[in-house]
Amino acid sequence: MSMKTVLCAVDISNDNRDVGVLKQAARLAEMEGAQLDVITVVPDFGMSVVGAFFDKGHHDKMVAEARTRLDDLVNTALGDGASDDQRHVVATGSAYEEILKIADTIKAELIVIGAHKPDFSDYLLGPNAARVVRHSSCSVYVVRS
């Protein structure tokens, strides 16, 4: 099976903890000669009670900051200028839902995602990685951090 697209999901809020995830995704994409797309998801406060506390342009600022941090993460993990070779997606909403939606949109054959060791809350709520694995229509490679 030859892959054309690998989607790597990273969390930019965890101080470069996903560098290893991104490096593994890049290795897999390179081995297959596949396009590497990198996604991060920012929360959608929208019309929630929390959203009422932010000014109108706050979401746009969050997305712009996320894009900058995503570029920085890619360059840190893969070397300066590496971010020019990948497509970057900053989505808004629920992390696992947006990852699955983008994977379907780009017809990814593989999703690479990081997972931390579960704690008690993960058993009640379910971590994003587990939800992606459970609901994905393509293969998922989980990198333990």
Labelled PLM ranges:
Residues 135-145:
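Short, flexible loop segments at boundaries between secondary-structure elements
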